[in-house]
Curated annotation (Swiss-Prot):
Linear cationic alpha-helical peptide with antimicrobial activities against both Gram-positive and Gram-negative strains and against the yeast C.albicans. Shows moderate mast cell degranulation and leishmanicidal activities. Has a very low hemolytic activity. Its mast cell degranulation activity may be related to the activation of G-protein coupled receptors in mast cells as well as interaction with other proteins located in cell endosomal membranes in the mast cells. Belongs to the MCD family. Mastoparan subfamily. Keywords: Amidation, Antibiotic, Antimicrobial, Cytolysis, Fungicide, G-protein coupled receptor impairing toxin, Immunity, Innate immunity, Mast cell degranulation, Membrane, Secreted, Target cell membrane, Target membrane, Toxin. The lineage of its organism: Eukaryota, Metazoa, Ecdysozoa, Arthropoda, Hexapoda. GO terms for biological process: defense response to bacterium; defense response to fungus; innate immune response; killing of cells of another organism. The keyword Secreted applies. This is Eumenine mastoparan-EF. It comes from the Eukaryota.
Amino acid sequence: FDVMGIIKKIAGAL
């Protein structure tokens, strides 16, 4: 589970 990856994905989707 890549936490930073998820955060970056959410940040990129915003």
